[in-house]
Every structure is written in C-alpha cells, then in structure tokens.
Amino acid sequence: LGITMGDPAGIGPEVIAKALAGKALRRLCRPIVIGSFPVMQQTVKSLNLHMNVIRVEGQETAPPRSNQLAVLDPLDRPLGRFPRGVATPQTGAASVLFIKKAVELAQLGCIDGIVTAPINKEAINLAGCHFPGHTELLADLTATPESGMMIVGGPLRIMFVTTHVAIKDLPALLTQTKIEKAIRLAHLALQDLFGIKKPRVGVAALNPHAGEHGLFGDEEARVILPATRAAQAQ
C-alpha cells in the first residue's frame, strides 16, 4: 500500500509513524510512505520510535524489515524549514505531488492501493491546486467521469450525494440527478467492492422528520423521493 504523507506541516507524518510502529498493519500489508524523507526522519526521531527510516527510489517497492519505515520521496529538493500547523503554498504543493506520485505508482501496478493522510485544503489552493479535496483530485488524475465518496465503518457503507460544501449551500445543491447518481454508485460499489449480490440502499432525508409533510422543508417530497423512485425503477 502506498501511504501519502498529506501536508508535511500537519498531523499526517505523526499518524503514519505511530501506525507503522506497531506490527498489526505490517501483518496486513507492505507499506511504503510517499512523502518527504527528512520530515519522516525527524518525526520518527521526535516520537522516540524504534524504527529506521529508509529511502526507496523510483518504482522499488521491496518490503522493508519490521523495524524499517520505507519512504519514497518524489521532491526534487528538501522542503527546508516551514511552520508547523500553518497552511503554506510550499507544503500544499508537496502534498499534491505526493498524491500524484501515488496515483502514478498505482497505475503502473507498483502498489495495490492508496491510503491518504490529511491534506490542508487551504494549502493546496494556495499552491494553485483548486480542488476541494482528495476525492475530486483523484478523480481528475485518473480521468474518472463518475466518482463519489464512500465511508466505511463496521456494517455501515455511506455514499455522499455532495462533498466538501457548506451546510448553508446544501439544499440548493441537491438535485434529482445527483441523488440518482449517488444511489447508482452505491449500488455498484456494494456489488463490485463488497460482493453483495443484491444490495439494499437506503436514502437519508435532509430535514428533521423527513420534512414532516412540508413543515420543516420540502426537499424530500420535491427532490429526494422522486430520485429514489426513479432509481427503484431502473
């Protein structure tokens, strides 16, 4: 698995180092971190973790020993000094480069999947990458015409109709087309990724009590229910 560092000024390097310090994840996969080699070195040292940070080059994905943390650093030059916890174009550009490299490795078949540490949305926009999040950026890099964000936890598999928008803007963004698309993508994902032959997809309401016949909003009757019925008919 390729694990992108996320924003070097953020929590990503620490989360990655702590996660890979244990044996549980290494029993499940062969991890390789795609990010800044000096930042990972400094992070491991500051946390007093008993791991050797090693650099791997190019498309090399040989599994490291249990006490090694393998890092593929695609940066042309070290990041140098930067403020922690602050959005800057410098670290924003680096985090985007890490994602692009991970996509390249996945498309070449060098890694089987990508795990992403947090990016800073403000920082990537400061760097000229005008995407609201990982989902939209990954769709663009892979030329994927239809995409959606699904979160998985235990028995729950939740597909979003909208992503990365302010709550106040949400009602105006809900359309029958978008809802039908989310239902269709959820159905396909449950079949193809989770092996569920006959998935059951539930559609959540927007308003309290599903609008209570218009007392608390009409999006359910006007948009959500027609989209649900259209999807059922397909």
Can you describe what each PLM-predicted range is?
Residues 70-71, 114, 147-149, 158:
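Conserved beta-strand scaffold positions in the cores of enzyme catalytic domains, especially
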Residues 1-134, 177-234:
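Contiguous, glycine/small-aliphatic-enriched amphipathic segments in soluble metabolic enzymes
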Residues 151-181:
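Ligand-binding beta-strand-loop-alpha-helix segment within the catalytic cores
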Residues 55, 73, 149-152, 160:
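Structural signal for conserved beta-strand scaffold positions within catalytic alpha/beta enzyme cores
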Residues 140-156:
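Short, flexible loop segments at boundaries between secondary-structure elements
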